[in-house]
């Protein structure tokens, strides 16, 4: 009996030590994480570290379409691309709230795709649990989304890092690329013509409330917000871009829709796939977008 108690106590002590070591290691890496091309790296930089005059936000389309190096060179303004694939508007609401705690950008560019405005099919925070307790806005969002049992589990460092500890460790081993400022260029050319969908679009009510909150945050801090719909080969006649045009018009938000721009959708060779520009396409698009940045900053002044 004493042996059983001893082994149980030893196992518990080992588990506790492992939990503490994993937690301390994870937090140390995250707090000093270099800029790499991993999604987690972009999240860490956006939530904790970066400041800039221009902030680009959006899902993978934004991540691959806006090159901050060109914006910085042409405007003289610092710029960071905080795009991340596979997340909803909730995530970008957190990004704006966190960024505005550190600095007041002159301009926030929010590229919105239809998937950002849809209800999540699974746990949208599953790959961000390692950041629980480190970011106030993110922690509050998780506490609101999760059950008491799940919140109890999140007190464990092993549980929080279970899915992504390998990715956390890779932050130290991956090639550092701070000069890209969050941008992720894509190589390769697509050769399939564009498609047109007539399916009507309707946003999820919760995601819409997150977008409304972003608009409110920007206005309360006197930050210029611009909404875009970057080039794509998936065109719509009653889709997200048409809905955004009405939404932005009602709220007097500048909106720039590039989905029906012939210089892009008639040239699939500028794309890596049907929704993402390749590096050459992103170069052309970012150069074109410079005039939008300058016009909105001049209008603000």
Q: Predicted regions span which residues?
A:
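Alpha-helical transmembrane signal-anchor/signal-peptide segments
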Residues: 26-45
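Short hydrophobic beta-strand that contains or immediately precedes a catalytic carboxylate
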Residues: 54-58, 277
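Secreted/periplasmic serine-hydrolase-like ester/acetyl group-modifying domain
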Residues: 125-223
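C-terminal regions of proteins
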Residues: 242-298
């Amino acid at each position: 009996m004493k042996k059983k108690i001893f082994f149980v106590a030893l196992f518990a002590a080992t588990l506790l030590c492992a939990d503490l070591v994993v937690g301390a290691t994870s937090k140390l890496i995250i707090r000093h994480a270099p800029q790499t091309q991993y999604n987690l790296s972009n999240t860490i930089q956006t939530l904790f570290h970066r400041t800039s005059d221009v902030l680009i936000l959006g899902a993978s389309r934004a991540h691959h379409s806006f090159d901050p190096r060109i914006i910085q060179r042409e405007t003289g303004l610092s710029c960071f691309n905080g795009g991340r694939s596979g997340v909803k508007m909730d995530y970008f609401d957190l990004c704006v709230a966190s960024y505005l705690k550190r600095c007041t950008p002159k301009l926030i560019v929010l590229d919105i795709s239809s998937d950002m405005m849809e209800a999540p099919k699974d746990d949208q925070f599953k790959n961000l649990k390692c950041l629980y307790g480190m970011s106030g806005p993110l922690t509050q969002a998780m506490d609101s989304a999760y059950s008491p049992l799940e919140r109890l589990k999140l007190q464990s460092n092993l549980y929080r890092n279970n899915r992504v500890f390998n990715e956390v460790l890779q932050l130290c081993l991956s090639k550092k690329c701070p000069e890209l400022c969050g941008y992720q260029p894509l190589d390769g050319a697509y050769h399939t013509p564009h498609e047109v969908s007539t399916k009507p679009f309707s946003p999820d009510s919760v995601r819409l409330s997150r977008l409304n909150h972003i608009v409110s945050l920007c206005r309360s801090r006197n930050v210029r917000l611009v909404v875009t719909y970057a080039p794509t080969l998936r065109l719509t006649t009653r889709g997200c871009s048409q809905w955004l045009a009405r939404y932005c018009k009602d709220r007097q938000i500048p909106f720039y829709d590039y989905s029906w721009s012939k210089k892009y959708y008639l040239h699939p060779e500028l794309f890596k796939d049907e929704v993402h520009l390749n590096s050459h396409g992103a170069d052309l698009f970012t150069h074109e977008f410079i005039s939008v940045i300058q016009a909105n900053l001049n209008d603000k002044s």
